[in-house]
Amino acid sequence: MSLQVLNDKNVSNEKNTENCDFLFSPPEVTGRSSVLRVSQKENVPPKNLAKAMKVTFQTPLRDPQTHRILSPSMASKLEAPFTQDDTLGLENSHPVWTQKENQQLIKEVDAKTTHGILQKPVEADTDLLGDASPAFGSGSSSESGPGALADLDCSSSSQSPGSSENQMVSPGKVSGSPEQAVEENLSSYSLDRRVTPASETLEDPCRTESQHKAETPHGAEEECKAETPHGAEEECRHGGVCAPAAVATSPPGAIPKEACGGAPLQGLPGEALGCPAGVGTPVPADGTQTLTCAHTSAPESTAPTNHLVAGRAMTLSPQEEVAAGQMASSSRSGPVKLEFDVSDGATSKRAPPPRRLGERSGLKPPLRKAAVRQQKAPQEVEEDDGRSGAGEDPPMPASRGSYHLDWDKMDDPNFIPFGGDTKSGCSEAQPPESPETRLGQPAAEQLHAGPATEEPGPCLSQQLHSASAEDTPVVQLAAETPTAESKERALNSASTSLPTSCPGSEPVPTHQQGQPALELKEESFRDPAEVLGTGAEVDYLEQFGTSSFKESALRKQSLYLKFDPLLRDSPGRPVPVATETSSMHGANETPSGRPREAKLVEFDFLGALDIPVPGPPPGVPAPGGPPLSTGPIVDLLQYSQKDLDAVVKATQEENRELRSRCEELHGKNLELGKIMDRFEEVVYQAMEEVQKQKELSKAEIQKVLKEKDQLTTDLNSMEKSFSDLFKRFEKQKEVIEGYRKNEESLKKCVEDYLARITQEGQRYQALKAHAEEKLQLANEEIAQVRSKAQAEALALQASLRKEQMRIQSLEKTVEQKTKENEELTRICDDLISKMEKI
């Protein structure tokens, strides 16, 4: 997941925090109005956070078939999946998905600087030690913990010279950050600080100084100068990349982090583990710097007793410091040589692990995590003491040569982890720890509050505990030598939790310690054949790992010296053990839940590696120098096979626990990445909404401007219309005045007409009265005439009636005469008839 800062106004100019603390820190007010809602403002990082930087891990990979170094373009072709049994492909293939996650996650080391000295916390972050093999040369201040905390990421906190004097940090200073946020941050940081693949080897960087300068592109220097602060530009010019300030700009006598840093865990994919930052003490006035390592080797018990000081401080001469600085600056590119350190009698210097080119210097890490770890330390010590007192202490870690580990048979008491297979996941030799390690540890006593319980244990015990599910487990080693005095003192320190201190954690003034300074003229290389004899043959490897292989662990361990091609032409100095752990951690992190019986990544330490053998660095004597003492080697190789098998079982249990914890932390990191992606989506959506709102507002403004222009034109036309209307109004006014005049004249006419009407009315009344009189007279005359006519009619009617009665009487007379005539006629007729008859 990568958090890309969206706007520079939310980012300060000081790019000194690259951790995940911004997820838990409250947002700060920028003084500007924000376009985000209240719910969206919580998703924006605070102002004082730096931009996210992608760190690329550019240690060259090798092709599985040709074993050639791959270019960055060819390395991307190895992402093809391989079968579970394809251990060769798993060994040589760098998990790109892990690398991509590491590029996205913010990488930060809790480093504190005091006068240019990198200070580390006393309690080590050993959560991801993985298969930290027991055979591991923890010489005086040369190893910082079991399995060698790999590639101490101190370079990310380089400090400018001008600010180095102002960085004195008190050991008891505690930040106000919440413990829960810090623990989750530490867990996510420890998970992604993985180690380089098993196919990569460590190379003596002094021989590749010129090659690194030739291969480093010019753009890297320019990029480094551009990205680092002003105080770290000098450091970038010398190395081509951002070198650690503790190496490039340290005062004379200061030891670089590679001088006593832990061997990197080579089996886990991804980048190297970062060592936690620690508390610091003042630097001595003589300009020298002493580095404290809590875990020291047992062969120091043979040295004078004045070597027993708090933390096994070691002081380098200026010549050695310059050589170490050259190694630190040149160890960032190219393959590195794998070397084994079995000469524990002398103090050995760590070969610098591969430098990651993508890191930037000049970043000051926060000071919160170290203080929280100091608070967590007493609880972890009490839990560890309870474990060591209840159960038996695991025996000495065994040197695993070449074997195949079957997880199903781990519970079988007769199972031998070394049997049968010649392939190995990791191989180391763990020298017994010095019995005087517990003496003079003021910082450890301050951090671990409770008194330690004293119980006897075997020769070498490895104690592992975890304070809580979120606390970082601390691997604690307690060893004893075969001598009687060493055994007696180791019993007192077997169950005591020792704080794991990384290089530069507690510089103690040299005038307070009795250990003499390390001189390079005392270092020499001696052929193992001169010490152990030539009885070990090549065919003796066939018996390695079998149940009958019990008689000579000394001869078995001598094979590492006799047949290791890396030690054939190695320089005459005790070289550190390069830890090659298996990739069980990387294989177990697959989301499909790979079963327990998955094979380990197989790496043959006895096979020839096709890499150039570098020559001795400057200031190191030639192989022909004085021989080394053989006592520490013999003491180391006298451990029995049973002890080695027991330690293998303990280491496997530790690996199971660490693997499950790594899976849990990996899941948390993935969830955190999803959350950050959602945060980014919310911010992007908010910005898109703001952009859309701006576009809409612009469109509305354009529309309003157009409306304004339209209204202006309408107003002009309305003014013209109003002027025309006003002219018409003036004309109408004149017309109305004419109407008023006409009305007055009409009123006069009406008055005249009314006067005439009244006069005519009067005349009408007069005429009406005259007509009425005449009508009355006419009516009277008509009545008289009518009465006369009626009288005359009555007279006429009476005369008519009289005449009608005369007519009726005459008619009756006529009728009677007629009847009489008829009767006379009939009588006559009768008489005539009768007369005729007669």
Curated annotation (Swiss-Prot):
Indicate, by first and last residue, each region the UniProt record lists as having compositional bias (Basic and acidic residues). Answer: 204-227, 403-412
Positions carrying Phosphoserine are 25, 39, 71, 175, 177, 250, 317, 402, 434, 558
Q: What is this protein called?
A: Transforming acidic coiled-coil-containing protein 3
Compositional bias (Low complexity): 132-164
Organism of provenance: Homo sapiens (Human)
- Where is the PTM N-acetylserine found along the chain? 2
Q: Subcellular location, in the record's words?
A: Cytoplasm; Cytoplasm, Cytoskeleton, Microtubule organizing center, Centrosome; Cytoplasm, Cytoskeleton, Spindle; Cytoplasm, Cytoskeleton, Spindle pole
Q: Which domain of life is it from?
A: Eukaryota
* Coiled-coil parts of chain: 637-837
Compositional bias, Polar residues, is annotated for: 492-503, 579-591
